[in-house]
Amino acid sequence: MGDTIIVIPARYGSTRLKAKVLEQLDGKSIVEHVWRAAKAAGEGKVLIATESPVIVEHCAKFGAQAVLTSEACQSGTDRIYEAVKNGSEDYVLNLQGDEPFVKPQTIKGVIKLLKKDSKIDIATACYPTFNDDIYKNPNAVKAVLTKDMRALYFSRSAIPYKRELTEETKKAPYYIHCGIYGYKKTALERFVNLPPSNLEKLEKLEQLRALEDGMVIKSILIEAAGPAIDTAEDLNEARKYIRNN
């Protein structure tokens, strides 16, 4: 698996919930949960990239390798590129540090898709839902996908809109995007050298930069997992999820 590296960007100065990756869930920090899932996938080297010595020190306590990156990184993708740009790997997985419920099989599935399809630049994962509360939540990013799972758009808005509620349209799920990206190394380099795009700045979704530049993103489908952690409310929901599962 020497052609693949998994990088977990873990920012101490996160905007909505500072130091969220250090918050405890079921006796382990959020970032440790993510790291353990990455190690269990067995798909290559696992590295944590952070701007904080506090996180580096914390990661050492549970045996993870962490590297310091610049505080000037504008996004998690910039951070992972700084960590891997001089490496020899052909495939780079960006596994966001606030996804404590990510499953090893999801990681394996994204990497498998990335390696088998020569036409795609980025692989990711989505899950179907019929839950209106999730669909209408701007923190749950919606994906519009073609029949062959190519991404047409990502949005915080409730899309696609069902203009008529028929028996047929009721059976059509919405797709929620998960915080995992597999990049071909060449695509990652191309991405970080692009300026932020107009749609990206409107939605605050960096994957739109790739779409606007014509890059091909495809997704695997997975079962819904527990929540990603963006806010204090999400953290409370995550703790409830652990108690109930």
From Swiss-Prot:
Q: What is this protein called?
A: 3-deoxy-manno-octulosonate cytidylyltransferase
Q: Name one GO molecular function term.
A: 3-deoxy-manno-octulosonate cytidylyltransferase activity
Q: Which domain of life is it from?
A: Bacteria
- EC class, as a word, reads transferase
- Does the keyword Thylakoid belong to this entry? no
Which EC number(s) does the record attach to this protein? Answer: 2.7.7.38
Q: Name one Pfam family in it.
A: CTP_transf_3
Gene Ontology CC terms, in alphabetical order: cytosol
Record's family?
Belongs to the KdsB family.
Q: Which UniProt keywords apply?
A: Cytoplasm, Lipopolysaccharide biosynthesis, Nucleotidyltransferase, Transferase
GO biological-process terms attached to the record: CMP-keto-3-deoxy-D-manno-octulosonic acid biosynthetic process; lipopolysaccharide biosynthetic process
Identify the pathway.
Nucleotide-sugar biosynthesis; CMP-3-deoxy-D-manno-octulosonate biosynthesis; CMP-3-deoxy-D-manno-octulosonate from 3-deoxy-D-manno-octulosonate and CTP: step 1/1; Bacterial outer membrane biogenesis; lipopolysaccharide biosynthesis
